[in-house]
Amino acid sequence: MGSVLLDCAHRAAVPAGGALAVDRVTFSELVEAEVAARPNIEVVHGEVTQIPEGHVVIAAGPLCSPALSEEVMKLVGGDALAFMDAAAPIVDASTLDMDVLFSQSRYEEQGSGDYLNAPLNKEEYEAFIEALTTADRVVLKDFEGGDLFQACQPAEEVARTGKDAIRFGAMKPVGLTDPRTGRRPWAAIQLRAENKEKTAYNLVGFQTNLTFGEQKR
């Protein structure tokens, strides 16, 4: 297809089974370099407070400044804007207990694959769900709406919809075998490398609005 972004993504790719996942720092640097190298693109560093005339693509973020927000609201109306923040927990690889975790991508041989898996039995899962749904969350700011994008909800919100909801989502155990028991676990948390050095891991599907203190717990 000749996509520059896809080329950058493949160059910044980290092991993720059949998915395309990237080292976010490397990917950002590659995209920035590509943009800066284009002779037909002028890069201007500074705050935009007014929307220019003509055809414009506005991609402000992660949080739009008040001045630009007001300009956008003049065009689309204040009720059309929403903001919801969610953090994606990243775990230091040195803190992982490799006596419990096992390496396997779904439906592949044990010991193979690009994911680490933390297996949970029924009792561990239920205790985890109880802790997840009762943990302290970040208090929403006045500009943050409560309407959530259904396909990318915080893990605690998914868990609140039913005790087994997340077990059929981010924590589904299908295609996995716990080498300690030789059986499929009741549930599992998958971890994917954040970088090629594998010094940090991302909890797959665990975007959250919990406070940082609760995330550490």
Protein language model regions, located:
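A conserved beta-strand/loop capping segment in the N-terminal third of enzymes
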Residues: 1-32, 36-40
